[in-house]
């Protein structure tokens, strides 16, 4: 990197020197030897040539400055590329759980503690629901498997899908614990789950909910504590998440645990009118 920077600087200096030499070579030989008249004044021809020389000097200076700026810009771009490479290398140390939760569309997920996942009691019954269970669990915990090279590319994709499913099922259990509720509380305060689209709820923050605890039965929805209704998430990426990864219990247990966050039920409702007259409700 340092050698490349040195080369850029030397090239610009060589170009500048060539330009200066060309300017000197192109100067007329008689410009500096114009005769002075008897009154001791420089002739008009010599004045014009002097101005031309001054203009040539200024152009050579501006050319050298522009070349220097170009070399500086190359140095800056090299520095930026170094910083981007450093940031990329830092990202390689990210755990699988952090990587998964930071994926686009996975904003509803919180990071499950490794200690919780390593406790077999918390994973009871999941081995029969998730294919490639052991390999998926190793992938979640960043444990290198000795059989990784034996799998085909298709099998590796299946293991990755199984890891996402297993993490989702673990996540549904974790968010019902005190630690999990606290993690979801932070996301709730940051409006990570979105706001209620209903006008009279005035932007009430929502909570994720599943309509079934069985995987692949339905996608995740958002529950509004104010109007007590469920809605589709606004993001199409979040709309593809399995609702079983959050379960049917979470939002209600959350509001029971943090009762002070439960808002008053919305009192206003939309009134239907035709030409200003309210419609009669049968």
From Swiss-Prot:
What Gene3D superfamilies does its record include?
2.20.25.20, protein kinase ck2 holoenzyme, chain C, domain 1
Major place of localization?
Answer: cytoplasm
List the residue ranges of the region (Disordered).
1-92
* Compositionally biased intervals (Acidic residues): 75-92
Domain of life assignment: Eukaryota
Question: Which residue intervals are annotated with compositional bias (Polar residues) in the record?
Answer: 29-47, 61-71
The cross-references to InterPro entries, in alphabetical order and at most eight, read:
Casein_kin_II_reg-sub_N (IPR016149), Casein_kinase_II_beta-like (IPR035991), Casein_kinase_II_reg-sub (IPR000704)
* Sample GO molecular function, one term: protein kinase regulator activity
A Gene Ontology cellular component where this protein is annotated is: cytosol
Q: Which cysteines are joined by disulfide bonds?
A: none
Q: Where is the composition biased (Basic and acidic residues)?
A: 13-28
Q: Which keywords accompany this UniProt record? A: Cytoplasm, Nucleus, Phosphoprotein
Locations listed in the record: Cytoplasm, Cytosol; Nucleus
Q: How is it modified after translation?
A: Phosphorylated by alpha subunit.
* Listed PANTHER family: CASEIN KINASE II SUBUNIT BETA, CASEIN KINASE II SUBUNIT BETA-2
Q: Which family does it belong to?
A: Belongs to the casein kinase 2 subunit beta family.
Q: What quaternary structure, including any partners, is listed in this protein's UniProt entry?
A: Heterotetramer of two catalytic alpha subunits and two regulatory beta subunits. Interacts with CCA1.
- Job description of the protein: Plays a complex role in regulating the basal catalytic activity of the alpha subunit. The tetrameric holoenzyme CK2, composed of two alpha and two beta subunits, phosphorylates the transcription factor PIF1 after an exposure to light, resulting in a proteasome-dependent degradation of PIF1 and promotion of photomorphogenesis. CK2 phosphorylates translation initiation factors. May participate in the regulation of the initiation of translation.
Its recorded name reads Casein kinase II subunit beta-2
């Amino acid at each position: 990197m340092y050698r490349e920077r040195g080369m850029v600087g030397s090239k610009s200096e060589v170009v500048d020197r060539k330009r200066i030499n060309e300017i000197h070579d192109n100067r007329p030989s008689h410009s500096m030897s114009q005769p002075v008249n008897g009154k001791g004044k420089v002739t008009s021809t010599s004045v014009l040539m002097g101005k031309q020389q001054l203009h040539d000097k200024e152009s050579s200076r501006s050319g050298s400055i522009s070349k220097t700026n170009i070399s500086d810009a190359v140095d800056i771009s090299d520095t930026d590329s170094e910083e981007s490479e450093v940031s990329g290398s830092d990202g390689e140390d990210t755990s699988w759980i952090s990587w998964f939760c930071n994926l686009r569309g996975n904003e509803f997920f919180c990071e499950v503690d490794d200690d919780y996942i390593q406790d077999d009691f918390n994973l009871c019954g999941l081995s029969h629901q998730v294919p490639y269970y052991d390999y998926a669990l190793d992938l979640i915990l960043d444990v290198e498997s000795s059989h990784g090279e034996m799998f085909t590319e298709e099998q590796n994709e299946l293991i990755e899908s199984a890891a996402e499913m297993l993490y989702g099922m673990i996540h549904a259990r974790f968010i019902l614990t005190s630690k999990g509720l606290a993690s979801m509380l932070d996301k709730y305060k940051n409006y990570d789950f979105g706001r209620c689209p209903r006008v009279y709820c005035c932007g009430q923050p929502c909570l994720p909910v599943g309509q079934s605890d069985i995987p692949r039965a339905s996608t995740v929805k958002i529950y509004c504590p104010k109007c007590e209704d469920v809605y589709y998430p606004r993001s199409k990426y979040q709309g593809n998440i399995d609702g079983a990864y959050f379960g049917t219990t979470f939002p209600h247990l959350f509001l029971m645990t943090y009762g002070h966050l439960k808002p008053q039920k919305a009192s206003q409702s939309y009134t239907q009118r035709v030409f200003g007259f309210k419609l009669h409700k049968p």
